[in-house]
Amino acid sequence: MILRIFGHDFHYECENLCRVYYPNEKIEIKYDGSGDDPLTVETRLFPEDGGARVEVITSINGSVRSAGDKVTAPEDELRDKCELRIAQLMFELLSAETGYTPPWGVLTGVRPSKLMLRLTAQLGEQGAMDYFTKGLLVSPEKARLAATVAKAEEQIVASSRPNSFSLYVSIPFCPTRCSYCSFVSHSITNSNARKLLPEYLEKLSDELGELGGIARELGLRLESVYFGGGTPGVLEAPQLDRLLCSGESSFDLSSLREYTVEIGRPDTVTPEKLRALRIHNVGRISINPQTFNQKTLELIGRNHTVEQAVKAYQLAKSYDFDCVNMDLIAGLPGESYEDFTASVDTAVALSPENITVHT
């Protein structure tokens, strides 16, 4: 598929919207008329007196559609207005061409509830709903969902003090690298990465000390801690113990509302590590099978079995954590809808306190 961009730099939004309609197509962005493809979307912006003119032309397997409009707005708002109008025109043409109307409208790459909160503060509840449905072309059902989630989030945020903060501690190492992963992480099967881990932990402890000092100087109150990765479970129990001790000596943890360590891979879970977490009052852990389909686990490069994931969860439950979370991923390579729902059913049957679904 070719996406042509003329007169603007909205390529990110335009590309994401094309992917909503054609998720399996490789999209090539061009800023000229070169190339030829049966699937082509052309977007244009021309400056005009008092504003700009935007146009969209779609050529899909010989079917050509076009639409355009003049956009007027104050100079400091014109760019955003043009970007939105191009997205609306793309939505109009591609929905007509494909017969598919995306329920989230032109929203891509954003958190709808966060946007809903901001718009509600600016426009009021009805104004925010109108902007979602009429401006962003979100279906009424999804707009109501965003509003419901936003209200729930608002209650949580409102309970935080103005001087509170959260701490994220990164362990960018994993047993192996999963085929789908885009995070910064190093597999400890690599000897260089394995040698680097102890030094990294030493520097990380130093950094925790520095940050703790800054927090005290600013009078900040630590509200939540999250150890993520990577896979924090790659740490041995003594390493985990020392790192948690560093956190305790660097920060006042008396006001914590949530203390999470994402153990990660089920094959890294051991009684010794779980014991260390409980000793240090970690209340929430995450064990991430990602799928309960053995073929998929092998395909994506995770060296654990479905049985190991279940046993790791059962072991963790025996240590009486406040919350055990399980991560699943929708859309893993080769998985069908039925494969994913089977994984969801398995996770639900285990009854963890929380299930997180990533896409």
Each predicted region: which residue ranges?
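Short Lys/Arg-enriched alpha/beta "domain-start" segment
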Residues: 1-38
